[in-house]
Amino acid sequence: MSEERLALSVRHVTSGYRDGGVLRRKGPYQEVLHDVTFDVRYGEILGLVGESGTGKSTLARTILGIVKPESGQVIHYTKRPQMIFQDPYSSLNPAYTVEWILEEPLRIYGKYDKAERKKRVRDMLERVELPEECLAAHPAELSGGQRQRVSIATALIQRPKFLIADEPVSALDVTIQAQILKLLKNLRDELELSYLFISHDLNVVYQLCDRVLVMKAGRVVEQGTVDEIFDHPQQDYTKQLLAAAE
């Protein structure tokens, strides 16, 4: 992993919402992120941890461009990031087959003929270790682990280099979690990916991530390598999170 090449830079970002949500422009402004600065290095998995309501999801939406920062910059050094969602039950359209779901981004955004789309879909299915029979299945016919593999394949089908994974294993049992974490790490190595991995589960973060970003009340209060954060935390808040996970 290179420490010099970056996948993403977030510089002094302050961001939030108007009352009524993301799209409403009227009403008082509610600041959620406060002067957030960090980098995601090319090829690394950066964990993002913090209690519910600390701004993790707002940060993800700001990076994706769904929420516009009031100040600061989000600088992408690769293609626009794609998202792996927490809940594969709701993120996959139940009306369509896996093949249709995987082909749809290529139909909309790519310049590929039918044969090229079919080949890329099958290649991606192999990458996420699913049998070809899954192509004809609807999401409801798959297990939770298989659905999450389809979600990962959907995020990767346009060949991005940076993924935001928002609690991607929290809905899975422990055995399947371990398999998905291994898959994510293998895909990182094989495809030279970078991840921002959002999780409330510090044990999962410890297993998967290279560095960790700790957020409290919309601010980054600590960041460092996994060993630095888990073995030598500096902030009381980080120590509290670690103690609660024991």
Ranges and model annotations:
Residues L64:
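Helix-to-loop junction immediately C-terminal to a conserved catalytic motif
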Residues V49-E51:
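The feature captures the beta-strand-to-loop junction immediately N-terminal to the Walker
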Residues E116-E133, L242:
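Conserved ABC ATPase "signature" region
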Residues V205-Q207:
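A short, surface-exposed alpha-helical micro-motif characterized by mixed small hydrophobic
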Residues H138-L142, Q146:
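Conserved ABC ATPase signature
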Residues I157-K161:
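A short, proline-enriched helix->beta-strand linker immediately N-terminal to the Walker B motif
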